[in-house]
A protein has these predicted regions:
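Hydrophobic/aromatic-lined pockets within catalytic cores
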Residues: 66, 70, 89-93, 109, ...
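Acidic/histidine-rich catalytic cores and adjacent linkers
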Residues: 129-251
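General alpha-helical segment detector with a strong preference for membrane-spanning helices
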Residues: 16, 83-84, 107, 190, ...
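Conserved, well-ordered core segments of regulatory domains
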Residues: 1-17, 21, 88, 97-102, ...
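RNase H-like nuclease fold core
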Residues: 1-77, 82, 86, 91-94, ...
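Short, charged, low-complexity patches
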Residues: 55-58, 113, 117, 206, ...
Length: 251
């Protein structure tokens, strides 16, 4: 069973290729990593499914977390995979949902010219260092106004999701960088990428993939994740106070 209370859950999907009957097929690894009230990270779910990333598989992952005992989460951090935001909100209605800022910055390079993208990045860095949500909201609106003519459709989408790009500003300063991206999941993805390259660019079977996932998870949980990062250690009392305040009010 899982701890019923978590400060944060980071979710992300990673594509890999598996060899099956002399053919390569795509699979998606659905990862969920929790940050406990003790400040330690733990892998909650790591499931490989054939085919492309899809909402039904994400529903299965989130439902599985609840079935295993998870009840209260303060903040979910995820990318803006189409349709995932309302699903996360439906399963955990009292959690903030933060959309990954790294994915946002990458998208700017797709939607804006090189010059505009550079300015977008500069303005976003200023938002990330905002004192509080109110200042961040104002700067975010100014950013959307600035690029409304260059990319009206995308700016419209950003405005609708403003609270989900700025949720990290509600939390202690030492945690804002961690809470604004899904980079925590990259600790596992990075190890898998090395294993993939060393295996010739793909995994030789589903069993091989599961075995190597287990190795990657164990090396983190038994290694560097055993010691609290400095930012987490300094912010932990405040994070737990925020957790207690929020969920006492929602009982």
């Amino acid at each position: 069973p899982l701890d019923p209370d978590l400060l944060a859950v980071f979710v992300d999907g990673k594509y890999v290729e598996l060899r099956e009957a002399d053919k390569l097929r795509s699979a998606c690894i659905y990862l969920a990593i929790g940050l406990g009230r003790d400040g330690k990270k733990r892998v909650l779910s790591c499931i490989a499914r054939p085919g492309r990333e899809n909402l039904e598989d994400w529903k299965s992952v989130l439902r599985g977390l609840i079935e295993r005992g998870l009840r209260r989460v303060m903040i979910f951090i995820q990318d803006d995979f189409s349709g995932l935001l309302p699903i996360s909100q439906s399963f955990f209605p009292n959690a903030d949902v933060q959309l990954c800022a790294v994915h946002l910055q990458r998208n700017a390079k797709t939607h804006l010219s090189k010059t505009d993208s550079a300015e977008f990045q500069q303005r976003w860095r200023a938002i990330k260092s905002s004192w509080d949500v109110e200042v961040g909201n104002r700067q975010f609106e100014e950013l959307c106004d600035r690029f409304a003519k260059a990319s009206p459709s995308w700016m419209g989408e950003l405005r609708k999701k403003r609270q989900h790009y700025l949720a990290f500003l509600k939390y202690p300063e030492p945690m804002r960088k961690s809470f604004s991206t899904t980079n925590v999941v990259e600790a596992i993805n990075g190890q898998l990428e090395i294993m993939r390259r060393n295996s010739g660019g793909y995994f030789h079977s589903e069993q091989t993939l599961k075995f190597k996932l287990g190795l990657a998870i164990s090396s983190l949980e038994d290694g560097r994740w055993r010691t609290l990062a400095r930012g987490i250690a300094s912010a932990l009392p405040q994070l737990n106070a925020l957790f207690q305040s929020r969920f006492e009010q929602t009982r």
